[in-house]
C-alpha cells in the first residue's frame, strides 16, 4: 500500500519511539514570538541549558506591537514581553526580527517570504496557526510553552502520529470567491471538530489552480476544524515561490529533486476522505462565535438549534432568519496571518479603488510584514487605500486579537479577514465576522456585507 504525504513527512523525522507509542520528532525549524516564549527561555536559564540549534530557530515580534506608532508601547505587559524576547534572543544567540527590522512581521508571514519555510520540513511555533506553513508540503503545527522549551533545549518533540484526512477540492471558483470562502464553507458544513486527531491534506484541481498565498489561507485555518495541521503537496508553484529567497537552500536543484517526492501515492488510503466541489461556492460570512457559524452571503441566518446558537445570537446581537446584508459593519480589518499578504492587499485594493469608505466605518489595512508593506507601497496600494479612507498601518497581528491597541469597541461589528471570531477575540464585547479580503473591503464601502460576485456591488443591496 502506498504512503500518504503525512506518512512520508513523519517517517523522515522520527528519532525514536517509546513504549507508549510516542515518536520523538526532529524539528527542522522553530519559530518564536514574544508571547509564548518568555517562560520557555526562563526554563533554560533555570536549568543552565543552551538553545540546542540557534541556527534552526528564528524569532520575531508581532502579537503585542502597535501598528500605528510602533515605537510608543504604552502597555506595561506588552513592553515587558517585547523587551524580554530581545534580551533572550541576545543571550541565547537566536536570530531576531526586531521592531523596524526589514524582516519583521507576523511569524507565519515572514517564514514563507524569507524562505525559512520549505517543503519537507517539520516546523513548530508557540502559536495555533503554525499550520499555515503546511501549504509548502511541510509538517507544521502549534505547540505550548512547555513544548517550546523542550524544542529550544533538544530540537526534538514527543508526538503521537495523527491520522490522515484527504480533502479533495474540485472545480473552479467563481469571480469574487476565494480560498477563505472554501475553508469557511468546510467549517460551516463539517464543524470545528471534524479534524480532531487528523492532519488535513488538501489536494485536487482547485489546489493546483491556487497560488501559494491562497494555499496558505487554507492551511492556516485547518486548526479551526480541529486538525493538528493542514498540508498540501509541493509542486512547481511551491518550488518557484521558495527559489531565490534569503534563507532558501543554495544547492536548490538537489533540494527540489527531494521535494518532488513529497506527495501522496496513488494507491494510498486516507483514514477519512472529504470531497468538495467549489464551482457553485459563494462568499461566506460568519454570524456567530466560532468559525463554523457561517453562511453564504445569499443565505439567511440559520435557526437556533441549541444553547450555543442561543448564546451566539445574543452575543452578536443578531436574529435567526436575518439577511446577511442587514448586518451592520462599523469596523473593517484587513490583515492577520490568514489574509495580510501582498495578493490579499491587491484584491482588497481592486475593490476600493476610486471609491470611499462609508461614513461612520473605521477601516484598517495592516500588512503582514515589513516586506509586504514595502512591496504594496511600491505598487501604490497605500495611496488607493488612504484615498478611499482606510488607515494604512505598520505590520503586526493588530486587530486579529485583543492583545494590542487595535481593538473593536464593545457591541460593534467588525468585518475581519482574520481566523477566529470567539467572544472577545478582538476586544471585550467585540462582534467579529470572518470574511475574505474582498468581502471586508466591500463592507467598508457600504457599512454592511455585499456579494463580491456582483459586477456592481450596488446590485447586492436590493437583496431581501
Swiss-Prot record:
InterPro entries with a match to the protein in the record: 3-IsopropMal_deHydase_lsu, Acnase/IPM_dHydase_lsu_aba_1/3, Acoase/IPM_deHydtase_lsu_aba, Aconitase_4Fe-4S_BS, Aconitase_4Fe-4S_dom, IPM_dehydratase_rel_enz, IPMI_cat
Cofactor requirements of the protein: [4Fe-4S] cluster
Enzyme Commission designation: 4.2.1.33
Key words, A-Z: 4Fe-4S, Amino-acid biosynthesis, Branched-chain amino acid biosynthesis, Iron, Iron-sulfur, Leucine biosynthesis, Lyase, Metal-binding
Organism superkingdom: Bacteria
Catalyses which reaction(s): (2R,3S)-3-isopropylmalate = (2S)-2-isopropylmalate
SUPFAM superfamilies in alphabetical order: Aconitase iron-sulfur domain
Gene Ontology biological-process entries: L-leucine biosynthetic process
UniProt keyword Iron present: yes
Molecular function as annotated in GO: 3-isopropylmalate dehydratase activity; 4 iron, 4 sulfur cluster binding; metal ion binding
Alphabetized Pfam families for the sequence: Aconitase
Pathway participation: Amino-acid biosynthesis; L-leucine biosynthesis; L-leucine from 3-methyl-2-oxobutanoate: step 2/4
Binding sites annotated in the UniProt record for [4Fe-4S] cluster: 337, 397, 400
General function of this protein: Catalyzes the isomerization between 2-isopropylmalate and 3-isopropylmalate, via the formation of 2-isopropylmaleate.
Assembly with partners or alone: Heterodimer of LeuC and LeuD.
NCBIfam families registered for this protein in UniProt: leuC, PRK05478.1, PRK12466.1
Entry's family note: Belongs to the aconitase/IPM isomerase family. LeuC type 1 subfamily.
UniProt-recorded name of the protein: 3-isopropylmalate dehydratase large subunit
Organism: Bacillus cereus (strain ZK / E33L)
Gene: leuC
Amino acid at each position: 500500500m502506498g504512503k500518504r504525504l503525512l506518512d512520508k513527512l513523519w517517517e523522515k523525522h522520527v528519532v525514536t519511539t517509546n513504549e507508549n507509542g510516542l515518536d520523538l520528532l526532529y524539528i527542522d525549524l522553530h519559530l518564536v514570538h514574544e508571547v509564548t516564549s518568555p517562560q520557555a527561555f526562563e526554563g533554560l536559564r533555570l536549568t543552565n541549558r543552551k538553545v540546542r540549534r540557534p541556527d534552526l530557530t528564528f524569532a520575531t515580534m508581532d502579537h503585542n506591537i502597535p501598528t500605528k506608532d510602533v515605537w510608543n508601547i504604552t502597555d506595561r505587559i506588552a513592553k515587558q514581553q517585547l523587551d524580554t524576547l530581545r534580551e533572550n534572543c541576545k543571550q541565547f544567540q537566536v536570530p531576531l526580527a526586531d521592531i523596524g527590522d526589514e524582516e519583521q512581521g507576523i511569524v507565519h508571514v515572514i517564514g514563507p517570504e524569507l524562505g525559512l519555510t520549505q517543503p519537507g520540513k517539520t516546523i513548530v511555533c508557540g502559536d495555533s496557526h503554525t499550520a499555515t506553513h503546511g501549504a509548502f508540503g511541510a509538517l507544521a503545527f502549534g505547540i505550548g510553552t512547555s513544548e517550546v522549551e523542550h524544542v529550544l533545549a533538544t530540537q526534538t518533540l514527543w508526538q503521537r502520529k495523527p491520522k490522515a484526512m484527504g480533502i479533495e477540492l474540485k472545480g473552479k471558483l467563481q469571480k469574487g470567491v476565494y480560498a477563505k470562502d472554501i475553508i469557511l464553507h468546510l467549517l460551516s458544513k463539517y464543524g470545528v471538530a471534524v479534524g480532531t486527531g487528523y492532519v488535513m491534506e488538501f489536494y485536487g484541481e482547485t489546489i493546483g489552480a491556487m497560488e501559494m498565498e491562497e494555499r496558505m489561507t487554507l492551511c492556516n485555518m485547518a486548526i479551526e476544524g480541529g486538525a493538528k495541521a493542514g498540508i498540501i503537496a509541493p509542486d512547481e508553484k511551491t518550488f518557484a515561490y521558495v527559489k531565490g529567497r534569503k534563507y532558501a537552500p543554495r544547492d536548490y536543484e538537489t533540494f527540489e529533486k527531494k521535494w518532488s517526492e513529497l506527495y501522496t501515492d496513488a494507491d494510498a488510503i486516507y483514514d477519512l476522505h472529504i470531497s468538495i466541489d467549489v464551482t457553485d461556492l459563494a462568499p461566506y460570512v460568519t454570524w456567530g462565535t466560532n468559525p463554523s457559524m457561517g453562511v453564504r452571503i445569499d443565505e439567511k441566518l440559520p435557526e437556533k438549534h441549541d444553547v450555543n446558537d442561543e448564546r451566539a445570537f445574543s452575543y452578536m446581537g443578531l436574529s435567526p432568519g436575518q439577511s446577511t446584508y442587514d448586518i451592520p459593519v462599523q469596523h473593517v480589518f484587513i490583515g492577520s496571518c490568514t489574509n495580510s499578504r501582498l495578493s490579499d492587499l491587491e484584491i482588497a485594493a481592486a475593490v476600493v479603488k476610486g471609491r470611499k469608505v462609508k461614513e461612520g466605518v473605521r477601516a484598517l489595512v495592516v500588512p503582514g510584514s515589513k516586506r509586504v508593506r514595502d512591496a504594496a507601497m511600491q505598487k501604490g496600494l497605500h495611496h488607493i487605500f488612504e484615498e478611499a479612507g482606510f488607515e494604512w498601518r505598520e505590520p503586526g497581528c493588530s486587530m486579529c486579537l485583543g492583545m494590542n491597541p487595535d481593538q473593536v469597541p464593545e457591541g460593534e461589528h467588525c468585518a475581519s479577514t482574520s481566523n477566529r471570531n470567539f467572544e472577545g477575540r478582538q476586544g471585550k464585547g467585540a462582534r467579529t465576522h470572518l470574511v475574505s479580503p474582498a468581502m471586508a473591503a466591500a463592507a467598508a464601502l457600504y457599512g454592511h456585507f455585499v456579494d463580491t460576485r456582483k459586477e456592481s456591488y450596488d446590485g447586492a443591496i436590493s437583496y431581501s
